[in-house]
Swiss-Prot record:
GO cellular component terms attached to this protein's record: extracellular space; Golgi lumen
Record-given protein name: Agouti-related protein
Subcellular location: Secreted; Golgi apparatus lumen
Record GO biological process: adult feeding behavior; hormone-mediated signaling pathway; neuropeptide signaling pathway; positive regulation of feeding behavior; regulation of feeding behavior
Region (Interaction with melanocortin receptors): 113-115
A Pfam family assignment: Agouti
Source organism phylogeny: Eukaryota, Metazoa, Chordata, Craniata, Vertebrata
Length: 134
């Protein structure tokens, strides 16, 4: 029973190959291009030829590539950029580790944790501090 079922499955799987193959050709010899197939009735369902681009589309694509190249060159060229003015303070919740500038908020202080490995500007609220959160 099992052998009959296995033989039937093998025949069903091999049937399309036997019916569609051309006599005297190996399976890959009949395919000259990607849009050709061994099965002539299925040739119309294959890959469509690529669409031809108009000159306007080509010009637009060239302009986009030039604009991208120019933008990339501006980003990567540090000499072409303006020099940034040094920041005079560190904002709240930003890292103040290694900075010699104070926090922007006068009520904030540079708060360090984990053996001074993680420091950031934070408002510390205490009862004696006039800037405490209430």
């Amino acid at each position: 029973m099992l052998t009959t079922m296995l033989l039937s499955c093998a025949l069903l799987l091999a049937m399309p190959t036997m019916l569609g193959a051309q006599i005297g050709l190996a399976p890959l010899e009949g395919i000259g291009r990607l849009d050709q197939a061994l099965f002539p009735e299925l040739q119309d369902l294959g890959l469509q030829p690529p669409l031809k681009r108009t000159t306007a589309e080509r010009a637009e694509e060239a302009l986009l590539q030039q604009a991208e190249a120019k933008a990339l060159a501006e980003v990567l060229d540090p000499e072409g950029r303006k020099a940034r003015s040094p920041r005079r303070c560190v904002r709240l919740h930003e890292s103040c580790l290694g900075h010699q500038v104070p926090c922007c908020d006068p009520c904030a202080t540079c708060y360090c944790r984990f053996f001074n490995a993680f420091c950031y500007c934070r408002k510390l609220g205490t009862a004696t501090n006039p800037c405490s959160r209430t």
